[in-house]
């Protein structure tokens, strides 16, 4: 839905979020839109999670990065959601070049404060996205023929399924998922 993901003077794209939404966004930007590793930057809070991105993106911990001093990023995808949305959005505002675009993809139930002064001074554009268009869906289906993209997406698939025979099995699976917030998806196999 973006006309320009990059520009000649701002060739880089950044993603905030080392979870599954950030991973899906990063793989799509690399394998579908052709953003190379040097120009695809992923920021996260957990080094172990960032390691999954290192085959196709440059990674940085948010705690160790000077967002105000960096230049060259035209588009930022905020994929953190939850309590981290506010800091990620404001770090994105600090990072992004003038006339840049910030896409909000992370979901939070709370209102977040943003640095509107810098949004106005830089002339930034914000948009929200949680659904794909027909054209994007068609691009995705075509991209699935790429074996490297398939392999990258397999990183989200868990090794085991939860076998659900009754409501106590379902409760156990949900409690376990909530207690261990890894970024792989939870698969439930119902035997009802």
Residue ranges and their predicted role:
Residues 65, 90, 134-192:
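C-terminal hydrophobic helical "lid"/dimerization subdomain
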Residues 67-76:
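A short acidic, Gly/Pro-enriched loop at the edge of an enzyme's catalytic core
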């Amino acid at each position: 839905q973006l006309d320009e993901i990059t520009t000649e003077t701002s060739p880089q794209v950044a993603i905030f979020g080392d979870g599954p939404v950030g991973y899906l966004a990063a793989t799509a930007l690399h394998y579908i839109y052709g953003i190379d590793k040097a120009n695809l930057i992923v920021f996260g809070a957990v080094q172990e999670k960032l390691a999954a991105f290192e085959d196709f993106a440059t990674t940085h911990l948010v705690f160790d990065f000077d967002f105000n001093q960096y230049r060259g990023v035209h588009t930022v995808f905020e994929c953190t959601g939850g309590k981290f949305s506010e800091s990620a959005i404001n770090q994105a505002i600090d990072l992004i070049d003038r006339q840049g675009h910030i896409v909000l993809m992370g979901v939070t139930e709370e209102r977040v404060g943003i640095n509107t002064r810098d949004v106005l001074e830089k002339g930034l554009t914000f948009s929200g996205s949680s659904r794909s268009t027909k054209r994007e869906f068609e691009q995705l289906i075509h991209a699935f023929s790429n074996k490297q993209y398939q392999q990258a997406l397999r990183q989200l698939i868990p090794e085991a399924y939860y076998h659900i025979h009754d409501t106590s099995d379902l409760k156990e699976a949900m409690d376990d998922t909530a207690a261990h917030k890894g970024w792989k998806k939870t698969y439930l196999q119902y035997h009802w």
